[in-house]
Amino acid sequence: MSFFALGVNHQTASVELREQIAFNAERLSNLLAEQRHHESLKDLVVVSTCNRTEVYAMAEDAESLLKWLADANNIDVKQLIHHVYRYENAQAITHLMRVASGLDSLMLGEPQILGQVKSALALSKEAQTVSPELNSVFEYAFYAAKRVRSETAVGSHAVSMGYAVAQLALQVFSKPEKLTVMVVAAGEMNSLVAKHLAEMGVAKMIICNRSRERADQLAQEIAHQVEVEIIDFSDLAENLYRADVVSSCTGSLHQVIAYADVKTALKKRRYQQMLMVDLAVPRDIDPKVESLDGVYLYGVDDLQSVIDENLAQRRQAAVEAEVMVNQLATQLITHQKVKEAGSTIHAYRQHSEEISQRELTHALEALHHGGNPEQVLQQFAHRLTQKLIHPTSMLLREAAKAESPDYFEWLQQHLQDVFDHERKPKR
């Protein structure tokens, strides 16, 4: 039984193929619940995100995982075979650690993937498809991810617009829990801004959007994290003073936040500072507002230069993180080998004791029937020696016949070292 990782990601498969083999939690839970009754493949975890679908399992071969993935999604194996990657044992462990650490992500170092892998493990545990051995691999991968994030800078620099705005707000205002944020337009970019700031723990989110339906949708997505208020687009100017942070991305051909509106808002705020972020092209905010005392204005180019610099820093940190992951993977593999050796040694010792007990019983019976004690003991020693060294002798003969001279030489030298050690006089 080996540990396998098999799947597709944004590098190996198109979004159309990834959509075909994606799982939602409910469907995956039902599939796993059925799978635990199959002896051939009942020990598995499935990680499914927008950028990857991967199966991690203890199995006899990778082909069974590939077939399961295809069958579960009602597609032909031939559609997958040229797009999947597969890793076994050491490589699979290293891959899992890289995934959990964000080193294999589309956005290098992104933190969400660790939570997604943890959720995948929890779902499999609930379905009872996780053995202690598989669980220990995942727990060590989480430990590796924690080390990578705490000891390297791979995840410490903003590399998306939404995250960059949130980090900027944290730099300008030291206490996010007191902030009121206004997002002007609720499109994809500002939705990410709103979600990042909500996760950061701001006090209130004001959504100003032309379409009430889209504003309601965004409000529902973040309402569990932050107090939300929706205002009409026509009420934008008169509500500006309420916002500590304003992020605008309307797609309008004309500016929607005028210099005079910001000046009035500052006066109403008693000149408390404002962070204004203009993510639109053409620009939404009159660039002259930057001249107002207390206003910090950032545009797309400002943020992009920060993101480019941060991404370069992440890539540099990723080199250090890769070294750490390889070291931790080696540690886990060594630990597993030692554990396996312990089991083998225990079985070998038990086997030897059984042989000894049988030979002892045979010798005692010979003595009971009047056998010469000296002859019985000599026969006992000879028979015991022959049976104990037989497996090692056979192993050495087979190694000599094999096409790997290095293994034979290693085994021969190792046995010689054992003999030399035993011959040393005891003090």
From Swiss-Prot:
Misc note: During catalysis, the active site Cys acts as a nucleophile attacking the alpha-carbonyl group of tRNA-bound glutamate with the formation of a thioester intermediate between enzyme and glutamate, and the concomitant release of tRNA(Glu). The thioester intermediate is finally reduced by direct hydride transfer from NADPH, to form the product GSA.
Its biological purpose: Catalyzes the NADPH-dependent reduction of glutamyl-tRNA(Glu) to glutamate 1-semialdehyde (GSA).
Record InterPro entries: 4pyrrol_synth_GluRdtase (IPR000343), 4pyrrol_synth_GluRdtase_dimer (IPR015896), 4pyrrol_synth_GluRdtase_N (IPR015895), GluRdtase_CS (IPR018214), GluRdtase_dimer_dom_sf (IPR036453), GluRdtase_N_sf (IPR036343), NAD(P)-bd_dom_sf (IPR036291), Shikm_DH/Glu-tRNA_Rdtase (IPR006151)
Protein species of origin: Acinetobacter baumannii (strain ATCC 17978 / DSM 105126 / CIP 53.77 / LMG 1025 / NCDC KC755 / 5377)
PROSITE patterns named in the record: GLUTR
Catalysed reactions listed for this entry: (S)-4-amino-5-oxopentanoate + tRNA(Glu) + NADP(+) = L-glutamyl-tRNA(Glu) + NADPH + H(+)
Binding residue positions for substrate: 49-52, 105, 110-112, 116
Protein name: Glutamyl-tRNA reductase
EC number assigned by the record: 1.2.1.70
Swiss-Prot/TrEMBL site (Important for activity) positions: 95
Stored HAMAP family: Glu_tRNA_reductase
Subunit structure comment from the entry: Homodimer.
List of residues binding NADP(+): 185-190
Pathway: Porphyrin-containing compound metabolism; protoporphyrin-IX biosynthesis; 5-aminolevulinate from L-glutamyl-tRNA(Glu): step 1/2
A GO molecular-function annotation: glutamyl-tRNA reductase activity
Swiss-Prot/TrEMBL keywords: NADP, Oxidoreductase, Porphyrin biosynthesis
